[in-house]
């Protein structure tokens, strides 16, 4: 099976493709020309190459299932993502980013600083960091357990000494029960994915 988030992504992709392909047509009516026209329409609409590649990947998976079930013989070519160079932080920017905020900063700014440090140290996914609970952090062993992973399996990850020190101080301020979320809102609740994204952008 796939995660709820993956299913939601598939639904969104198919909804977007519906503007470029008649989703009401039967398999008998679906042709290679129709698929080619869909790709041409996507390109003309100004959709980025990487987005088209993502849409095509989902639709190709759907067609693969349809072929296995005997509904169609059609397939969609593999569209490569257009390589883009992502900017990285300079040493000066990284030092400024990781500089600890002033002691009189509010909880959100302090929490965001800890989150940025954690992400740089671990590189974990947004869904993973949002689901970490206080009890998942073992400061004595310098390890953290990821409950929410892409594979659905628990994962134990080591912490560097500096990150363990940062978390130790943060957790003494954050407090809360073992089952509470480590990186929470000011009300002690789980941060939404959008809230986490906005918090990181605002801190940057």
Feature-to-residue mapping (PLM):
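Conserved catalytic core of the tyrosine transesterase superfamily
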Residues: 1-204
């Amino acid at each position: 099976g796939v995660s709820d988030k993956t299913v939601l992504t598939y639904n969104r992709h198919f909804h977007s493709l519906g503007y470029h392909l008649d989703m009401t047509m039967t398999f008998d009516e679906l042709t290679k020309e129709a698929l080619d026209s869909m790709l041409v329409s996507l390109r003309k609409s100004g959709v980025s190459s990487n987005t088209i590649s993502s849409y095509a990947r989902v639709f190709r998976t759907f067609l693969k299932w349809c072929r296995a079930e005997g509904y169609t013989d059609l397939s969609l070519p593999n569209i490569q993502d257009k390589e883009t160079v992502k900017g990285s932080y300079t040493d000066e920017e990284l030092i400024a980013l990781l500089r600890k905020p002033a002691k009189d900063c509010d909880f959100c700014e302090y929490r965001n600083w800890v989150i940025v440090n954690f992400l740089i140290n671990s590189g974990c996914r947004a869904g993973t960091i949002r689901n970490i609970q206080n009890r998942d952090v073992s400061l004595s062993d310098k390890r953290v357990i990821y409950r929410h992973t892409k594979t659905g399996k628990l994962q134990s990850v080591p912490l560097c000494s500096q990150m363990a020190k940062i978390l130790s101080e943060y957790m003494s301020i954050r407090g809360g029960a073992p089952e509470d979320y480590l990186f929470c809102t000011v009300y002690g609740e789980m941060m939404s994915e959008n809230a986490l994204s906005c918090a990181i952008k605002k801190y940057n």
